[in-house]
Amino acid sequence: RFWILISQVAMMLALLPLIFIEVKSVNLTLIALLTLHNTFVAISDISIDALAADSLKEDQLANANGFMWGSKTLGRGTGMALATFVFYGYGVNEAFFLLILLMSFIFLFPLFSKELSYKAGFQSESYKNRLTLKELIAGVSQSLFNMSALAAMTFMIFSNIGYGIFDVIYNEFYIEVLGWSGEEIGYLRPIGMWLGGLLGLSAGVLAFYFGKRFLLLFFITCQAFIFLAVSSFTADTPDSLSTIAIIGVDAVDAGWSVLIFSILMALCTTNTSATNFGIFMGFGNISMLIGNNIAPLVLGSGDYGFAFIVAALSLIPCLLTGYYLTRS
């Protein structure tokens, strides 16, 4: 909870200068402020998920994580739609001002929340508010140095590489190659996020009927096929296919994210569960960073089609480790 509050304040302070700075192009000031903001976004995300890992019992994880991730994805879609409207209707400074207002409202939730002094379901066990370095290392080692945890870390380190590549180049690809406008993309992409949010909210029910393994592998395979399909798109590609791709990539990404996070939470059962889950999430953030940074290199080594093929191939380790993690 402490790190959630600190991160939320830092995120708002990092964006505050952008209300007054005229932004006409990318510059060092903009890069520095957004990098600082995104750093605390990552810390906040890890802290929120770690708090959930501590606050929920194992049999609650799938449904609760579905609600968490589904709500987050719905929020991202709504935010993108609202940002597109404000940006094109009023300007970038007004968009940042509105963002800070919304963040100030959201800040009230962690401010008035409470944190358990124990891992949910393990009230009878002794837990300390602060651990020595030796105790921390012992607790982390107990949970992370086993085959399931190693498979989970492998999954997470590859999980967002493809999405990270896509996120960097899709906008330019849709504008330069497919002939779309930035405004069209901005109004369309939230639909995929909203669909992903609905998938997240219903993940617990879907997993009950279809099985967690089938759904996880199905969503990952769908995302890989979308990347492969986009690699073949040209200026003559029907808008309907381009629309399905840009909507589908966010929808299926949210679907498998909900499932894998519930699996990761179930692996965190020691008194360092929050730290352990934070490590898993850290690997996921590193994966996105890898994808974002190699995207220009991959694009420079070939073309857009080659970059999307690399994005698809990066999901193969996730299929293998996902199969292992969902064994009975």
Label each residue range with its predicted role.
Residues L5-K24, T221-T237:
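C-terminal ends and interior cores of transmembrane alpha-helices
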Residues N271-G300:
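A late C-terminal transmembrane helix in Major Facilitator Superfamily
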Residues E58-F67, G182-E183, C268-F280:
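Loop-to-transmembrane helix entry/capping segments in MFS-fold secondary transporters
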